[in-house]
Amino acid sequence: MIPESKLPALGTTIFTQMSALAQQHQAINLSQGFPDFDGPRYLQERLAYHVAQGANQYAPMTGVPALREAIAGKTAELYGYQPDVNSEITVTAGATEALYAAITALVRRGDEVICFDPSYDSYAPAVALAGGELRRIALQPPHFRVDWRQFAAALSEKTRLVILNTPHNPSATVWQREDFAALWQAIAEREIYVLSDEVYEHICFADGGHASVLAHPQLRERAVAVSSFGKTFHMTGWKVGYCVAPAAISAELRKVHQYLTFSVNTPAQLAIADMLREAPEHYRELPAFYRERRDLFIEALRPSRLEILPCEGTYFLQADYSAISDLDDVSFCRWLTTEVGVAAIPLSVFCADPFPHKLIRLCFAKQPATLLAAATRLCQL
């Protein structure tokens, strides 16, 4: 007997499809967002150390104390706010689990949730499984800025949650402090929560650095901020993330977390805590690290017929291929992989409504040689 699907429209993600296609055709994989280089040697050594020391049993449900303390210190350093170690920080099995737990905890059947398209593909299924209704606000290229009048018009008595993402995947734009002020002005008199997906917080090239919801005194009282150590330390396979939220929200989120995963890899948590404490220069220097790769890739693509859109954060570039082909973006990405040998992601998969723009996403979290080889192929188009 085959059960009725709760998510009938969903299949294998485009990221899995394109990575498989890239492997099949031995293409340079700039589609899925992972590095082709390893993370810090010190972090690997600390993981091995903690395994050898016997830290191989369940961690506390909320995360090991050393890591929660390190997160609190980093948050205070960067955003001027020190969350309570015991009641406001929860370590999760990657950022995606944190997003799912937050949505499940906050969204009730019939609630409306606002997100901004293009958007990360895990939001919609989580909202659907919680019984909520997703209302999407389309952001327009090339700058993908929020129209706050349009946002205010989208609010209703049913609005329960706003999901934002900064630095933004896939558009590579970032929110400014003025955006958070505008968000607060729009929701201050309403019972609306905020889920701020900040997994690329340390890959921000904007003047003044990353603007976090945690730096806004009023918003953080009703917000969940989510981040990812996989992005920060080039270790996406470790799947360790965390969220910061007020105690009352964290308590509800933890009820979901304890029955999703209960706890997270113990030696990895301890190794990350060591890394944050002993080598904070890693995340402080990360913007410069990725800016160098971004600039190298953009310069190498200059002779191509691709139009590169502004990149203020993340490790993704958007490229307009309208001067090259009339194909839709999904077909173009498949052709690019099979015939040119470079795998990319079509922007339309991040949107529910028809996406008329000819844009693809390219990941530059790669070694310089990989980026130059990909650029050589793309410049031949």
Identify the role of each PLM range:
Residues 3-94, 101, 275-278:
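N-terminal small-domain helix-loop-helix segment of the aminotransferase-like
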Residues 73, 153, 335-344, 350-381:
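PLP-dependent enzyme catalytic core of the Aspartate aminotransferase-like
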Residues 105-127:
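Conserved PLP-anchoring active-site segment centered on the Schiff-base-forming lysine
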Residues 129-135:
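A short helix-loop-beta submotif of the ANL/AMP-binding
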Residues 132, 189-192, 220-221:
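A short helix->loop->beta-strand "cap" motif at the edges of active sites that frequently abuts
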Residues 139-207:
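Active-site phosphate-binding strand-loop segment of PLP-dependent enzymes
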Residues 215, 220-291, 295, 299-300, ...:
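Conserved core segment of the aminotransferase class I/II
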Residues 273, 289-298, 308-321, 355:
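Conserved glycine-rich beta-strand-loop-beta hairpin in the small C-terminal domain of fold type I
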